[in-house]
From Swiss-Prot:
PANTHER family: UVRABC SYSTEM PROTEIN B. One of its GO terms (cellular component) is cytoplasm. A motif (Beta-hairpin) lies at residues 92-115. GO terms for molecular function: ATP binding; ATP hydrolysis activity; DNA binding; excinuclease ABC activity; helicase activity. The keyword Lipid biosynthesis does not apply. ATP binds at G39, V40, T41, G42, S43, G44, K45, T46. Keywords: ATP-binding, Cytoplasm, DNA damage, DNA excision, DNA repair, Excision nuclease, Helicase, Hydrolase, Nucleotide-binding, SOS response. The lineage of its organism: Bacteria, Pseudomonadati, Pseudomonadota, Gammaproteobacteria, Legionellales. This is UvrABC system protein B. It is found in: Cytoplasm. Residues 26-183 form the Helicase ATP-binding domain. Belongs to the UvrB family. InterPro entries: Helicase/UvrB_N (IPR006935), Helicase_ATP-bd (IPR014001), Helicase_C-like (IPR001650), P-loop_NTPase (IPR027417), UVR_dom (IPR001943), UVR_dom_sf (IPR036876), UvrB (IPR004807), UvrB_inter (IPR041471).
């Protein structure tokens, strides 16, 4: 246990970090159920939590409000703890359309989803780490409170094999099929197995690159090895191995048979109710759909929408909470909730929206009433299952303030950076004044964030600034996660200087190059101009030595006053600390790739953009000729499975087509 968790870092805790670390550790050792780390932007809250985890030596679940922040945290903890099991648990849907019925138009919408195979593998790897290891750190989103396969059924489906044990090949293959692995005779992919004589190759569903080879001799396991499925190279000989199921929802055969009997009984009961109410169409629909599901479960062991029978599959009573990731956590686990002022209300809001949709499906005969128990946790159930918890936020919400037994304050940054200076200027001349400020900041080589109240205003301001020769982009709600990361990356690299947004410039945007944050119409009281929103938005300039914030307002609202008072309180504390310890504030020099997961996407596009100048003077004929040549190269690389080269040429090809359209 001595070095269960070990941090790798060139830095030691500084500023308020040592005090905060000691306070949180003391609280955990004293048995406090809930604590809050009130840390300003850029104060190194992640580093503080890493030291708490290292000291406590306990498995940890970290929850973030969205996939973007979860990816950022995953990257940071992976760097701090390279020797430990840092895992990622978010929704594996790239696209998800839940099953729904609209009575007004008599429209039934079938469930439609696109599953990201890589994220599914990471989810399986996360639960495997919690089961097998004491040094697991799981970074998750609100997906952690949604129904997951029952851990007892999951553990009963494990396949344990040891060298020298008696094991019939047919039994192994039957077990793999029950675990939902599929047989193949071609190249081995994740979740598949292949048989050549007495050799069984298995590509575990939780593995990213390595497969397992089982060699049998006369019904005895003769050899077990880990190998590379691409090259066939043996990487390591193993004395024993445990193969985990392909999905969390795998269920033993006897449980399936029990479930079918319970579903049949509920179906008869529900049909009697519907017929008594003269709902004949609903009764016929329910009988047809449920009987089809029963047939599929008996034949295949699963069916489409099997999660709707999760109450029976996990052997629960009506209304009982579903099994979730929390059921896989060991009793001594820690729970860290990042940006808690957003994440806590998010957790509280998941249950009701899900319930309303499912009640309609039940009332109109699309699902049995037991489907209502396939749901996320209610907030009180989440509280019951939560181990010792630390909430992290620069602006803790009312729940954290009310329930925390200890608040560790982290106001002083290790870099000595002070909170931005805040000015208030009149609304009447806000656009012209902003233009003047933007030009000054650009001349210094820094960037600017501007936040507006409406989409229309953001669009108009972007157009106006662009017309006046300023390189500007608009970040709106239609931009997906990856594109949003690319836009932020381009801002940091200086591809453009001003980023305009509405409510997208708050939590977790790590941009040291931003020297000015401008908040237009700051005196319009509401969600976007609340005390928390203002403090968070002002904080976006806190990573720059010259960071400033300008609030355009004609009147001083209560939210503004409280936000300014809190910012000033922090500034005074930071300045006093710097003076006492002789610290000169230093800017944060973080490379773009350090901050953004998936930055390579933007990097490739930047490289392509750099080639643009050599094509600008080409004639349309020359461009067309080059486009045709690139198209042939692209398809040739794709046919040879050289997808990275094909993608690189594709970007250049699209750039040239765009150039040709302009001529």
């Amino acid at each position: 246990m001595k070095d269960l968790f070990k941090i790798y870092s060139n830095y030691q805790p500084a500023g308020d970090q040592p005090t905060a670390i000691a306070s949180l550790i003391d609280g955990l050792e004293s048995g406090l159920a809930k604590q809050t780390l009130l840390g300003v932007t850029g104060s190194g809250k992640t580093f503080t939590i890493a030291h708490v985890i290292q000291a406590m030596k306990r498995p940890t679940l970290i929850m973030a409000p969205n996939k973007t922040l979860a990816a950022q945290l995953y990257g940071e903890f992976k760097a701090f703890f390279p020797d430990n099991a840092v895992e990622y648990f978010v929704s594996y849907y790239d696209y998800y359309q839940p099953e729904a019925y609209v009575p007004a138009s008599d429209t039934f919408i079938e469930k439609d989803a696109s599953i990201n195979e890589h994220i599914e593998q990471m989810r399986l790897s996360a639960t495997k780490a919690l089961i097998e290891r004491k040094d697991a750190i799981i970074v998750a989103t609100v997906s952690a409170i949604y129904g997951l396969g029952d851990p007892d059924s999951y553990l009963r489906m494990l396949l344990h094999l040891s060298r020298g044990e008696q094991s019939d090949q047919r039994k192994i293959l039957k077990r793999l099929a029950e675990m939902q692995y599929t047989r193949t005779n071609l190249s081995l992919e994740r979740g598949q197995f292949r048989v050549h004589g007495d050799v069984i190759d298995i590509f575990p569903a939780d593995s990213e690159k390595e497969a397992i080879r089982i060699e049998l001799f006369d019904d005895e396991v003769d050899n077990i090895a880990r190998f590379d499925p691409l090259t066939g190279e043996i990487l390591q000989r193993l004395p024993r191995v445990t193969i985990f199921p392909k999905t969390h929802y795998v269920t033993p055969r006897e449980r399936i048979l029990e479930t079918v009997e319970k579903v049949k009984a509920e179906l008869q009961e529900r049909l009697a109710e519907l017929n008594a109410q003269n709902k004949l169409v609903e009764a016929q629909r329910l009988e047809q759909r449920t009987c089809f599901d029963i047939e599929m479960m008996l034949e295949l062991g699963y069916c489409s929408g099997i999660e709707n029978y999760s109450r029976y599959l996990s052997n629960r009573e009506a209304g009982e909470a579903p099994p979730t990731l929390f059921d896989y956590l060991p009793p001594d686990a820690l729970l860290i909730i990042d940006e808690s002022h957003v994440t806590v209300p998010q957790i509280g809001g998941m249950y009701r929206g899900d319930r309303a949709r499912k009640e309609t499906l039940v009332n109109y005969g699309f699902r049995l009433p037991s489907a209502l128990d396939n749901r996320p946790l209610r907030f009180e159930e989440f509280e019951e299952r939560s181990p010792q918890t630390i909430y992290i936020s620069a602006t803790p919400g009312p729940y954290e303030q009310e329930h925390s037994d200890n608040v560790a304050e982290q106001v002083v940054r290790p870099t000595g950076l002070i909170d931005p200076e805040v000015e208030i200027r009149p609304v009447k001349t806000q656009v012209d004044d902003l233009m003047s400020e933007i030009r000054q900041v650009i001349a210094q080589g820094s960037r600017i964030l501007v936040t507006t109240l409406t989409k229309r205003m953001a669009e108009d301001l972007t157009e106006y600034l662009s017309e006046h020769g300023i390189k500007v982009r608009y970040l709106h709600s239609d931009v997906d996660t990856v594109e949003r990361m690319e836009i932020i990356r381009d801002l940091r690299l200086g591809e453009f200087d001003v980023l305009v947004g509405i409510n997208l410039l708050r939590e977790g945007l790590d941009m040291p190059e931003v020297a000015l944050v401008a908040i237009l119409d700051a005196d319009k009281e509401g969600f976007l101009r609340s005390e928390r929103s203002l403090i968070q938005t002002i904080g976006r300039a806190a990573r720059n030595v010259k960071g400033r914030a300008i609030l355009y307002a004609d009147t001083m609202t209560g939210s503004m006053q409280r936000a300014l008072m809190e910012t000033e309180r922090r500034r005074e504390k930071q300045k006093a600390f710097n003076l006492k310890h002789g610290i000169t504030p230093k800017g944060i020099n973080k490379s773009v790739e350090d901050i953004l997961e998936g930055a390579y996407i933007g990097k490739r596009k930047t490289m392509v953009a750099e080639q643009a100048p050599r094509y600008t003077h080409w004639s349309p004929q020359e461009l067309a000729k080059q486009i045709n040549a690139l198209e042939k190269q692209m398809y040739a690389h794709a046919q040879n499975m050289e997808f990275e080269l094909a993608a690189k040429i594709r970007d250049e090809y699209l750039l040239l087509k765009e150039q040709l359209m302009k001529i």
